[in-house]
Design a protein with these regions (language model features):
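PLP-dependent enzyme catalytic core of the Aspartate aminotransferase-like
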Residues: 1, 7, 16, 83, ...
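Short, Lys/Arg-enriched N-terminal segments with co-localized hydrophobic residues
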Residues: 12-22
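N-terminal "arm"/small-domain region of PLP-dependent enzymes with the aminotransferase-like
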Residues: 35-96, 229
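Active-site phosphate-binding strand-loop segment of PLP-dependent enzymes
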Residues: 75, 175, 179-233
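Short loop-beta-helix segment that forms the pyridoxal 5′-phosphate
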Residues: 103-109, 117-141
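Conserved PLP-anchoring active-site segment centered on the Schiff-base-forming lysine
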Residues: 142-161
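Active-site C-terminal subdomain of aminotransferase-like
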Residues: 227-230, 237, 242-348
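Conserved PLP-binding catalytic core of the aspartate aminotransferase-like
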Residues: 324-331, 338-373, 383, 387-388, ...
Length: 419
């Protein structure tokens, strides 16, 4: 009997009444998933992939030879193809090797890992930092480590999926407050007190990336002080360029030193590679090193990424030129869109969603923009709520005003073509 025919064989099992039931065949099981994907396509929600062959940059070269202006990367500081970082990575490969083949507490800690943790702590003004394979892992390994069934987590309704999943893993009581709504946050803090929570932790994104809205972190910290709660911020879409010196949402909101836990990524503005971190109070970081499962059971950050990241933070401390240019080009782009009648969410962040609402319209709009030479992607359910489809555009420091003019011109042309 072949392996496939064994899969297709109808098996039998007994139910709780002792009756024999037929089990679904393997093909029947797999057809469930096929139908699910077909439904996604029919609803206009299918997320495809468009491979490119060049480094990530303001422009990318596609497999078919086309060169597109990239307007959808998290490459905020334009460092994905930076020669200085590439050279630092090459140098680290020569000095430290390709990988460490171990977790941190066995034999996976090199000196550059400790140096990078110290460098991040110094940049953010925190006590200590712990590195992860990604920020998703940082968030996934946070809540179950520091919260128990006696505690409560109060989470913004628009938090990133990694926070949502991380909260699901812990046994703490869960409260969700309306996006950036301080009145509702206070109500949930009161509910947590009434429930007898021992520790209260407020969890929020620093920037809500689907909308480009910056968190009211001062309001969050004020309420945390009032109700004796800890504050956790995922600053993945902020560190490196938000705030006068790029130190993130806490700097932007004037609450440096008042945030207990900052999680973030090395995979967006900070070079665009991979890796994450949790930075904050020493007592919390110490416990994470002992108990956080993604840290204990995942390989250490690749040496080349650690080495290049050290170089990156040196660059950020030397000059704010990149974030200053990004701020200027973002303001120009936002004004051009508004002046030409596009529906965008007001703000200052370089993540600028162009609202189209209908899922199929957004998908077709993105397709036509690609045909005109602009790489954008339609965002639809479940990434955003149903009926809130959009083209999420993202400015980077390597864009020029001429690039912005071309992008807006293409937006206008596609709008006219689609009526």
């Amino acid at each position: 009997m072949t392996k496939k025919s064994a899969w297709n064989k109808v098996g039998k099992r007994q139910n709780k009444n002792g009756e024999v039931e037929k089990m679904a065949r393997k093909d029947d099981i797999l057809s469930i998933y096929t139908k699910e994907v077909e439904g996604i396509k029919e609803a206009g929600l299918f997320k495809g992939e468009a491979p490119f062959v060049s480094p990530q940059g303001a422009r990318v070269k596609m497999e078919d030879g086309r060169e597109l202006l990239c307007m959808c990367a998290n490459n905020y500081l334009g460092l994905g193809d930076n020669p200085r970082l590439i050279e630092a990575a090459k140098r680290t490969y020569d000095e430290k090797g390709y990988g460490v083949a171990s977790v941190r507490f066995i034999c996976g800690t090199q000196d550059i890992h400790k140096k990078l943790e110290k460098k991040i702590s110094g940049f953010l003004g925190t006590d200590d930092t712990i590195l992860y394979s990604s920020c998703f892992d940082a968030n996934g390994g946070l809540f179950e480590t520091i919260l128990t069934a006696e505690d409560a987590v109060i989470s913004d309704e628009l938090n990133h999926a990694s926070i949502i999943d991380g909260v699901r893993l812990c046994k703490a009581k869960r409260f969700r407050y309306k996006n950036n709504d301080m009145k509702d946050l206070e109500a949930k803090l009161k509910e947590a007190d009434e429930a007898g929570a021992r520790i209260k932790l407020i969890a929020t994104d620093g920037v809500f990336s689907m909308d480009g809205i910056i968190c009211n972190l001062k309001g969050v910290c004020d309420l945390a002080d009032k109700y004796n709660a800890l504050v956790m911020v995922d600053d993945s879409h902020a560190v490196g360029f938000v705030g006068k010196t790029g130190r993130g949402t806490a700097e932007y909101c004037g609450v440096e030193g008042r945030v207990d836990i900052i999680t973030g990524t090395l995979g967006k503005a900070l070079g665009g590679a991979s890796g994450g971190y949790t930075s904050g109070r020493k007592e919390i970081i110490d416990l994470l090193r002992q108990r956080s499962r993604p840290y204990l059971f995942s390989n250490s950050l690749a040496p080349a990424i650690a080495g290049a990241s050290l170089e990156l933070f040196d660059m950020l401390e030397e000059s704010t030129e990149l974030r200053d240019h990004l701020e200027e080009v973002t303001a120009y782009y936002r004004k051009q869109l508004v002046d030409n009648g596009f529906d965008i969410i007001p703000g200052t962040h370089p993540c600028v969603p162009v609202m189209l609402y209908d899922e199929k319209t957004a998908a077709e709009f993105a397709k036509r923009m690609m045909e005109k030479g602009v790489y954008v992607v339609a965002f639809s359910y479940p990434v955003v709520p149903k009926g809130k489809a959009r083209i999420r555009t993202q400015v980077c420091a390597s864009h020029t005003k001429e690039d912005i003019d071309f992008i807006v011109k293409c937006f206008i042309e596609v709008r006219e073509e689609m009526g």
